[in-house]
From Swiss-Prot:
GO cellular component terms attached to this protein's record: chromatin; nucleus
Chain intervals with Low complexity compositional bias: 231-246, 253-267, 283-299
Source species taxonomy: Eukaryota, Fungi, Dikarya, Ascomycota, Saccharomycotina
Protein's gene: MGA1
Chain positions covered by the region annotation Disordered: 229-299
DNA-binding region boundaries: 3-118
A Gene Ontology biological process term: pseudohyphal growth
Record's protein name: Protein MGA1
PROSITE patterns found in the cross-reference section: HSF_DOMAIN
Domain of life of the organism encoding this protein: Eukaryota
Length: 456
């Protein structure tokens, strides 16, 4: 059920005949209703009864929150009351501009009238809605660096930087006084002179150091060491001036014409700001001083890639899809072993199931034969059970025979020969080749060759 809002409650009050003396529909227009705000009975018999309060101003405020408009056309009673006759006869008339609030409106039509947004959430707290002109302060020295790099900027460009508004202030502070001199059009952005001075912080000094390194590392790559990027917070430093940050003029680099220029030229290294840590610099120096690991000579290895050869031999012996042929020795496929094991499991499961079913049926028949009071239907059931028992016994015997045949076939099969891990490429599978005995060849001496006749 949908909750009852202020609009539903107001519509129900207007339909009550007992309160029509103080609030009622207009007899000529079904979209207009009247109320007597200064009548004490309106506060007592209407507001306190339906809204649990007697504040007329709060009731009128709710009307405005839901979009009701007060009409300014006075009635005859109101004109006489304004003349000083009776104040309780003053009437106000309201209507809703959408036309959804009328005498015959139902709940579905009244649901279309929504309350205006007040900037307050459901928890009762006011939402923090920032205006588009709220901009935080920008470092003045950094803006000086940007202005020197980009050159003179027209007075129209700074207003486009911060959403088209020349007034910039933070929501947490009062807006500072901005004084714009007349010579700013030729000197650069006016935001630089209008920003309030700030105390140098660790982040500001780190940004200044990075800006100086980025500007000067192209011509002087070794001028700034890595120690400049780490700023000690205990030692306050002064804000660098634009002249100190700008450095010497940059020279345009031409095309490299010789190999010596390629050797002497080094690319700039820009260190981005990182969180300050006391032991970071010492750890970085230790890492730079550690020598690189040396590579042993090629002759120290027995094979060029011993680990690769071992992994290849192991993967060949464990290959599930293909057999490995090495020195006329064929290894069985691993997939056959898995299929054989699966078939053994299926046969064993079927054997156990049939044995259990046979035992249960036999037990049922033996218990049924001992009962004397059995009808003809029980005899027919016993006959079917005997037939099923005979079939299951035959199946059990066949499975036993199949299992015996399978075991005999397994005994004939040859087992897999494992591969040996080798560390020398010249000798592979020495244990397998040593077991192969070559045919004996007779040794003939020189004397036998001389006495043996030649056969042509």
């Amino acid at each position: 059920m949908q909750p009852k809002t202020f609009v539903h409650q107001l519509h129900a009050i207007l339909l009550e005949p007992e309160v029509n003396k103080w609030i009622y529909w207009s007899p000529t227009d079904n979209t207009v209703f009247f109320l007597k705000p200064y009548d004490p009975n309106f506060s007592t018999h209407v507001l306190k009864r339906y809204f649990k309060h007697g504040n007329v101003n709060s009731f009128v405020r709710q009307l405005h929150m839901y979009g009701f408009h007060k009409l300014s056309h006075p009635s005859p009673d109101q004109s006489s009351a304004n003349n000083g006759n009776v104040k309780e006869l003053v009437e106000w008339k309201f209507t809703h501009p959408s036309g959804f609030f009328f005498k015959e409106a139902n709940a579905g039509i009244l649901n279309k009238i929504q309350r205006k947004s007040t900037g307050v959430g459901k928890d009762g707290k006011r939402k923090n809605i920032l205006s588009p002109i709220s901009v935080s302060y920008v470092d003045a020295s950094r803006l000086n660096v940007l202005s020197q790099q980009s050159g003179p900027v027209s007075a129209r460009e700074p207003s486009n930087m911060f959403m088209g508004s020349p007034v910039h202030y933070s929501t947490s502070q009062s807006p500072p006084h901005i004084s714009i001199p007349q010579q700013q059009q030729s000197s650069g952005p006016y935001l630089i002179s209008s920003l309030p001075p700030q105390q140098p912080t660790v982040n500001m000094m780190r940004r200044q150091s990075i800006s100086a390194r980025m500007m000067n590392s192209y011509d002087y790559p070794n001028q700034f060491s890595t120690q400049d990027s780490i700023v000690q917070p205990q030692q306050p430093q002064q804000v660098l001036s634009p002249q100190a940050l700008s450095g010497p003029p940059m020279k345009k680099s031409g095309t490299l014409s010789s190999t010596d220029d390629l050797k002497t030229t080094s690319l700039p290294i820009v260190n981005y700001p990182m969180p300050y840590h006391p032991g970071a610099f010492a750890q970085q120096q230790q890492q730079q001083q550690q020598p690189l690991p040396t590579v042993p000579p090629y002759s120290s290895y027995s094979t060029p890639f011993p680990s690769m050869m071992n992994s290849l031999s192991n993967s060949a012996s464990n290959s599930p899809a293909l057999g490995v042929c090495n020195n006329n020795v064929t290894l069985p496929k691993k997939s056959n072993i898995s299929e054989r094991q699966a078939l053994d499991n299926h046969i064993q499961t079927l054997k156990n199931s049939l044995s259990t079913i046979t035992d249960l049926i036999e037990k049922h028949i033996n218990s049924a034969s001992q009962d004397e009071n059995k009808t003809l239907t029980n005899d027919a059931m016993n006959k079917d059970l005997r037939t099923s028992l005979s079939l299951l016994q035959n199946s059990k015997e066949e499975i036993i025979q199949l299992e015996s045949k399978w075991m005999s076939m397994q005994s004939v099969k040859t087992t897999a020969l494992p591969l040996q891990e080798t560390t020398n490429t010249s000798s592979t599978l020495t244990s397998l080749t040593s077991s192969i005995i070559p045919k004996s060849i007779p040794i003939i001496t020189k004397g036998e060759v001389a006495t043996k006749p030649a056969s042509y």
